[in-house]
Amino acid sequence: MALKYKLILASGSPRRVDLLNQAGIEPSRLMPMDIDETPKKSEHPRSLARRLSAEKAEAALAAIKGDITWKGSYILSADTVVAVGRRILGKAEFADEALSSLHLLSGRNHLVYTGICLVTPDRKIRQKIVETKVRFKRLSGFEIENYLASGQWRGKAGAYGIQGLAGTFVQKMVGSYTNVVGLPLYETILLLTGEGFDVHSRWPEG
């Protein structure tokens, strides 16, 4: 029988948990890492996603150091960045920030980058960056006003979650949908299985 290694998800995102559950994976532990997500001067959005996903994984690894309960476990982290050109749209915490982001996204293409980072049981670090191109329709003031009132923009990169009401704003998308949600499922499973994590024996039997 294949060994069922433990998987630590260095995130508290319900969306990422749901996506892993969709693939039949139940993380053994959730470890949201509180790191400084401020972009460095002139940092490219792709580079930011790569750096932050690595920093989250490394912080989780440091947090379990010396704890034999988690010896030999996998650590998975992810960070999603939304950008118009090189302009990074952070996680909106206030309505005026969300309003600014929505005006910028309205009628334009933008890119969503998710960096995924996997720490293997022998402590190798593997990374992958996934990019999706998204185009919003031109938003009316009425749509923006009602979306802001919904509160669904809070804490979201680019002030929106595609799996919620803002999904109605998407005119066109090229690339992974799950990447925009927050965890590119195909690439994540590829990364896990490529490093010996047994995904498929965890699938339920009918």
From Swiss-Prot:
UniProt catalytic activity: dTTP + H2O = dTMP + diphosphate + H(+); UTP + H2O = UMP + diphosphate + H(+)
Q: What class of enzyme is it?
A: hydrolase
Q: Which CDD domains match?
A: Maf
**SUPFAM superfamilies attached here?**
ITPase-like
Q: Which UniProt keywords apply?
A: Cytoplasm, Hydrolase, Nucleotide metabolism
Swiss-Prot/TrEMBL cofactor(s) = a divalent metal cation
Q: Where in the cell is it found?
A: Cytoplasm
Which residues of this protein are catalytic?
Answer: D79
Q: What is its EC number?
A: 3.6.1.9
Keyword Oxidoreductase assigned = no
One biological-process term from Gene Ontology?
nucleotide metabolic process
Q: Where is this site: Important for substrate specificity?
A: R15, T80, Q163
User: Which GO molecular function terms does the record list?
Assistant: dTTP diphosphatase activity; UTP diphosphatase activity
- Give Gene Ontology CC terms: cytoplasm
Family stated for the protein in its record: Belongs to the Maf family. YhdE subfamily.
Instruction: Say what the protein does.
Output: Nucleoside triphosphate pyrophosphatase that hydrolyzes dTTP and UTP. May have a dual role in cell division arrest and in preventing the incorporation of modified nucleotides into cellular nucleic acids.
Query: Which HAMAP family does the record cross-reference, listed alphabetically?
Result: Maf
Its protein name is: dTTP/UTP pyrophosphatase
Please give the organism.
Rhizobium etli (strain ATCC 51251 / DSM 11541 / JCM 21823 / NBRC 15573 / CFN 42)
List the taxonomic lineage: Bacteria, Pseudomonadati, Pseudomonadota, Alphaproteobacteria, Hyphomicrobiales
